Amino acid sequence: MKKLIIAATLAALAMTSAAMAAPIRDPQPGDLKANANYGFDQKEGGRSAKSLLTGGDVTYVLSNHWDIQYVNNYTKGDNDNKINENYLVGNYRFTPYLSAFAGGSYVKTETYNTTKSYGYQVGLKGQIPLAARWQGFASVGVGDDVYTYEVGVGYDITPNWDAHVKYRSSSVDVDNYDDDVKGWQVGMGYKF
């Protein structure tokens, strides 16, 4: 029953609106994990996006409940529009499966002009074991400049290496520049 409730919570998060890659499984104080993502079938507005390395994140586990995380998401459209999202957030784990995050954002858009915006991002993240080495994850974030969600699945190749695939969507509104970024990403993570 507990897994059903958690799965329903993750599905609800995915259907509403800081994106993260596969989270650390069984986090311990002092753990450090880095993820890098490769985008395919990406869209910037209604156009294709040609950016391949689409960002990643670095997470450091401070305690049994707290992490600090830096996240970068980069998209370059076929028309050379660029959107670079950066977040520095604190994550608080309520349970091994559900956490909340809050922090600052810096978003830079390069179109016919360049705009930069500092703001905030808050949201929820969830993860659930699916099988011995598999886990599902989802997140939803809201802020003054960006609304974002993602849903994905990760596979632990070794205790330190994992691979993941996810769908990510981000709605950006920076100084009267509105755009959407969405698409599929694959990535690798390493826990030091």
Could you describe each region identified by the protein language model?
Residues 1-33:
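Cleavable N-terminal export/targeting peptides
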Residues 20-77:
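Short glycine/proline- and aromatic-enriched beta-strand/turn motifs that initiate or cap beta-hairpins
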Residues 32, 64-70, 96-102, 130-136, ...:
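Repeated loop/turn-to-beta-strand initiation elements of outer-membrane beta-barrel proteins
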Residues 33, 55-59, 87-89, 121-123, ...:
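Membrane-embedded beta-strand positions in outer-membrane beta-barrel channels/transporters
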Residues 36-44, 64, 72-76, 104-110, ...:
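Transmembrane beta-strands of outer-membrane beta-barrel pores
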Residues 43-52, 75-83, 110-120, 140-151, ...:
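Solvent-exposed loop/turn segments connecting transmembrane beta-strands
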Residues 59-61, 91-93, 97, 127-129, ...:
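Structural signature of outer-membrane beta-barrel channels/translocons
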Residues 122, 128, 155-162, 179-192:
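Outer-membrane beta-barrel "beta-signal"
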